[in-house]
Amino acid sequence: MEKKFLKVGKSISFKFNTDGLECNLTPGMVYNIKVDRFTENISLEESGSLSLPSKVYCTARDERFINKVINSYNLSENGFTGVMLAGLKGSGKTVMAKCIANKSGLPIVNVDKNIRPYILKCLVEKLGDTSVCFLFDELDKLLEDYDDSVLLQVLDGSDTKGKHMILFTCNNTDDISEYLIDRCSRIRYWREFEEMSPSLIMEVLNDKLNDKKEVKSLTDFIKDNFEVCSFDNIASFVKEANDYPTTTFEELFEDMNLSSKGTIKPHSRSCKNSGIKSKKKDVSCDCCWDCCCAG
């Protein structure tokens, strides 16, 4: 295969001049798209590898889904294998997208909201038969001021000579173009993310909670009280429980950026029964100044 790129340091340019060394894109390497604001020339910049937690919590169903996506891409002959991971914030969509991207064995091109649709279209044309995995995190936010008609053209494959994987994550599907929904030729796989199952919650607590005697009690507390049982919220709460081992679950909960199902139900570690927490936090003199949960 003819090499289409030139490398100078970490900067990867398309071969429109003779400066630099000829190269191919590296499997598993993340590339950010760079656009010269004067000439609009497109280049790719190496950005290392995707960061993942030391342990990824994955169900057997998750594993089957990931393997199916990879297998379908490998069986495809051209165009895009599209995947949408949608649903609850902090539920592991981005982690799964990264796992799929890594397992694909492809160079990974990160697409952020600063990359205009026509730039993406031009990039696909320049890539030719070089296969990559495109990663769009939080597509719903990106589409707020995005011409999605060009994205639809890209997914239709009219400018695609090779084959690519394209991974999307999305929190709010209401913001997604109706022309992406129920269109398997554009997005073949659509996975909805919901709350963590009790068995998965217990697995996380067994791994992360210092006081193993409290695993069952904290699992019950989470199931009974957390309005949103996402990995993000649960991992943050476990860290609080480890950092403040003498504080009741209720007090930890009251101080965090969490909403309850209603009246807080106490469990083993608890030593008080008072307090009702509404779904929306009330403004008081004890305001939470910083959000301790990512995303």
What are these regions (language model features)?
Residues 76-97:
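Walker A/P-loop nucleotide-binding motif
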Residues 115-116, 140-141, 171-176, 195-201:
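Conserved nucleotide-binding/hydrolysis micro-motifs of P-loop NTPases
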Residues 22-55:
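Conserved ASCE P-loop NTPase core motifs with emphasis on AAA+ ATPases
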Residues 134-137:
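Hydrophobic positions in the central parallel beta-sheet of the AAA+
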Residues 1-30, 183, 190-295:
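C-terminal alpha-helical "lid" subdomain
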Residues 64, 101-130, 145-149:
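Short glycine-rich substrate-engagement loop in P-loop NTPases that contacts/grips substrate
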Residues 45-82:
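Pre-Walker A (pre-P-loop) alpha-helix and adjacent loop at the N terminus of AAA/AAA+ ATPase modules
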Residues 140-184:
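Conserved catalytic/switch belt of AAA+ P-loop NTPases
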